[in-house]
């Protein structure tokens, strides 16, 4: 198969996944008990007022008509209007999405910076105390709920030690940097505002560590497994027989080849972090998409919930596409059916 045929297949898969997410999210959101019109009107509003709001929102129409209108608007780049705020969903996503991306990128960076070295050391010192510690850390990270871990680090670092802030993106007395990318760290650097940069960095540490902890163990285990396979190959034994230093063999021979099968896991971790940010943002009062969609669900804001699902699923599938193409570029044997 050629590169372009694989790209075409992946793009079709992307379209089908997003379409399936639209259908499933629409059905589930309309099966949730409750009436958005009643929530907007208030408990004391008359039935006539509630019915008028339902007509304005189009909720009085059959479900297939509502779905057709939603899909038609979606093809025109319109994710609808938030029932709760009255603003376009796309406009709200532009406000909240950068905060979630900044948190996810920083968490992924931490997971890679800590997880890859731990995976290497775990493979080199197989069945020793560090290897057992890394495996224990991986199991603990996977089995620990993010909200519980988040509450724990808040109690420790904010409540008892009082060395890090417990929530938000900035202290209340600081103004956000001029909006360029929506990433406070990057925008503060572009603005040359060191005070805002370091304050934003302090606020980012706890939620990023909480998100990174789960994936840190996964990354370490994946690197360990790939490294063990590479270290048992003939070319490694040949390099050792040639008298090359042990760590040179590990870092310059085994590690580059071990990273190739790990690309899929490392890339998809970013998509998982976008979903995982929902609970973490709620715990840390982080003003991103996670906290926004939780509020939208509580208000039965169907357009906002569906917009969140479409954007996050699209981002997840897009990351999957990029990972597949990157994997194909690094190892062309896959396109010819020769890769593993």
Task: Give the residues covered by each predicted segment.
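Residue-level recognition of pore/gate-forming positions within transmembrane alpha-helices
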Residues: 14, 22, 44, 111-112, ...
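Hydrophobic alpha-helical transmembrane segments of membrane transport/permease proteins
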Residues: 17-68, 157-196
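Hydrophobic alpha-helical membrane-insertion segments
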Residues: 18-23, 141-162, 269
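Residue-level signal for discrete positions within transmembrane alpha-helices
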Residues: 96, 100, 136-143, 152, ...
């Amino acid at each position: 198969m050629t590169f372009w045929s694989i790209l075409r297949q992946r793009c079709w898969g992307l379209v089908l996944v997003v379409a399936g997410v639209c259908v499933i999210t629409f059905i589930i959101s309309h099966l949730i008990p409750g009436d958005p019109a009643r929530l907007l009107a208030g408990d004391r509003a008359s039935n006539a007022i509630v019915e008028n709001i339902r007509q304005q929102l189009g909720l009085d129409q059959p479900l297939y008509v509502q779905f057709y209108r939603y899909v038609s608007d979606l093809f025109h780049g319109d994710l609808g209007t938030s029932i709760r705020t009255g603003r376009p969903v796309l406009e709200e996503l532009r406000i909240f999405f950068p905060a979630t991306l900044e948190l996810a990128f920083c968490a992924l960076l931490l997971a890679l910076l800590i997880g890859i070295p731990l995976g290497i050391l775990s493979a080199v010192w197989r069945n020793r105390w560090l290897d057992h510690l890394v495996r224990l850390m991986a199991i603990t990270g996977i089995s620990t709920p993010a909200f519980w871990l988040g509450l724990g680090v808040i109690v420790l670092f904010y409540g008892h030690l009082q060395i890090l802030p417990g929530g938000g993106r900035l202290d209340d007395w600081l103004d956000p940097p001029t909006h360029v990318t929506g990433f406070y760290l990057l925008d503060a650097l572009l603005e040359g505002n060191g005070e805002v940069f370091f304050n934003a960095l302090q606020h980012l540490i706890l939620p990023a560590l909480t998100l990174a902890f789960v994936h840190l163990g996964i990354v370490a285990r994946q690197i360990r497994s790939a490294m063990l396979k590479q270290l048992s190959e003939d070319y490694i034994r040949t390099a050792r027989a040639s008298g090359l230093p042990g760590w040179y063999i590990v870092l310059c021979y085994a590690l580059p080849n071990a990273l190739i099968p790990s690309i899929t896991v490392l890339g998809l971790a970013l998509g998982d972090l976008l979903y995982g940010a929902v609970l973490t943002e709620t715990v840390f009062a982080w003003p991103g998409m996670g906290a926004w969609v939780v509020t939208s669900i509580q208000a039965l804001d169907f357009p906002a919930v569906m917009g969140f699902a479409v954007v996050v699923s699209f981002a997840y599938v897009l990351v999957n596409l990029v990972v597949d193409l990157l994997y194909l570029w690094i190892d062309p044997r896959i396109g010819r059916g020769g890769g593993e």
